[in-house]
């Protein structure tokens, strides 16, 4: 081989190797402080789940059964919600491939899956296992789990089947045997995926309800810490730096409540706090957003760990509860433009904290039954996704 040919051969090898490294790195969803992470929550209820069919939704379409029965409670009330793409199953990989393409095209690059496990076993796992993880393009999207460890009341999930709001299908607290099953299953099935989202080498694992977490360990903070330390050690055995536990409460309340919860998450060794809903509900979306910023400021005052902002698209859970009406929904100024303005403030918030990952959480990707979703519908089309893209492209920076 002559000298010129050798040089080209070596150069080609370097290029191929560089491309290989880039491809490998692109599938690893490790947070970097210079990158933005826009994470949308997924409520995986719209498919035929065995436990769901037996106890909750009987027609084989999951919660679409309830969503389709939404009815207007006041003039101009947009019910039932109508998906632009129709009533698709969230455990269909072809559907999720479309989701991932739409999300990544518009600046959403992480999905947070609500994940359920009761003493009776798993619930709604198929959306993640068969939908997301079998989507051909899934590794272009980061993901992590939020353990949705809340009780499952009868009327919350299907008021048309149950009118009894005092009984529950499953209790959220789990015993030690089930807890160790959770730990093993989560590490083996999910943490090992190259696109599982990590902070400082630690897979992120969200927890929705602190009180129910404590109840799984007899109500003891000390025993709960031991349980979480067990999870951490098992993750280290699997080759990870530990587990980044993240608290995602359903909404905000008082400063005193924030102080109590901040002390608890730090005693348990949590790594961060965000929210499932942004809190501060109001009929006016602008007031709702301003209230949520005050709640964010409360958390900032009491936390010694990172807080990541949450932005809700809206709120309307009237399909679940016949007694609710106008005062229980967000219906003034609830538009993609208002949402974009609020998201731009969240972006500014993370920009002002250069020492922590630039993570923003959006409620939600598909909370149709709660009126909070980015997915395109028959009213706004792709309006909310376009709003995310505009903000992440800097088009709203001039309004700061």
Which residues fall in each region the model found?
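Bacterial N-terminal signal peptides that target proteins for export
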Residues: 2-10
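Bacterial N-terminal signal peptides
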Residues: 10-20
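Glycan-processing catalytic domains of CAZymes
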Residues: 29-400
